[in-house]
């Protein structure tokens, strides 16, 4: 089910409850010229978003929660592509999070064209992320400042707010001390 929010619709997620167990571990990464595949250890379920955010402390990052099968997610990525090169030159990191609902083969085919860091969460990590953050559907976005604080979040609303909203937020975050 898709709903219209902030111009672009989002794809609804099923609400599930997964017991949370806090654990602190670091991500591992495989890097290429234009993208990096990162993973969280399978044991990390609770606070998976916070674990990912820690990897970007000291940088401004746009976090995009999406899926390969989600047309609004793919349309939003196309929109972001027009502002991404300029923002990357300014040091903005682009972080893409999906789960096992995105078929591995499809995801592997898509990510080389999506410049940034990519996480493919386990089924349990994905369900916990959706529940902990109150994410009703995808895509959803979060901008984090260099100090790790939140500059923008629509995790509980969904939909891409548009480049006219996201770009100024990212630029302001880059300038922030």
Task: Name each region found by the language model.
Residues 1-42, 176-177:
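N-terminal targeting signals for export/organelle localization
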Residues 36, 85-126, 135:
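Conserved segment of the thioredoxin-like fold in thiol-based oxidoreductases
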Residues 40-61:
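A short beta-strand-turn-helix
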Residues 53-55, 109-113, 117, 151-155, ...:
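Alpha-helical subdomain
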Residues 59-61, 65-69, 103, 137:
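Short pre-active-site segment immediately N-terminal to redox-active cysteine/selenocysteine motifs
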Residues 59-60, 77-98, 168:
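Conserved helix-turn-beta segment immediately C-terminal to the redox Cys motif
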Residues 65-82:
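Conserved redox-active cysteine motifs that mediate thiol-disulfide chemistry
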Residues 124-169:
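Thiol/disulfide oxidoreductase modules built on the thioredoxin-like
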């Amino acid at each position: 089910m898709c709903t219209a929010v902030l111009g672009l619709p989002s794809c609804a997620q099923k609400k599930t409850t997964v017991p949370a167990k806090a654990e602190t571990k670091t991500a591992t990464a495989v890097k290429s010229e234009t993208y990096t595949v990162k993973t969280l250890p399978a044991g990390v379920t609770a606070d998976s978003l916070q674990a990912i955010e820690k990897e970007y402390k000291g940088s401004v990052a746009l976090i995009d929660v999406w899926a390969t099968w989600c047309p609004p997610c793919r349309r939003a990525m196309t929109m972001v592509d027009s502002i991404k090169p300029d923002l990357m030159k300014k040091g903005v990191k682009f972080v893409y999070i999906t789960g096992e609902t995105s078929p591995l083969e499809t995801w592997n085919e898509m990510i080389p064209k999506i410049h940034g860091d990519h996480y493919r969460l386990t089924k349990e990590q994905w369900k916990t992320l959706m529940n902990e953050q109150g994410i009703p559907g995808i895509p959803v976005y979060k901008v984090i400042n260099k100090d790790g604080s939140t500059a923008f979040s629509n995790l509980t609303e969904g939909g891409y707010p548009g480049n006219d909203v996201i770009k100024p937020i990212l630029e302001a975050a880059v300038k922030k001390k």
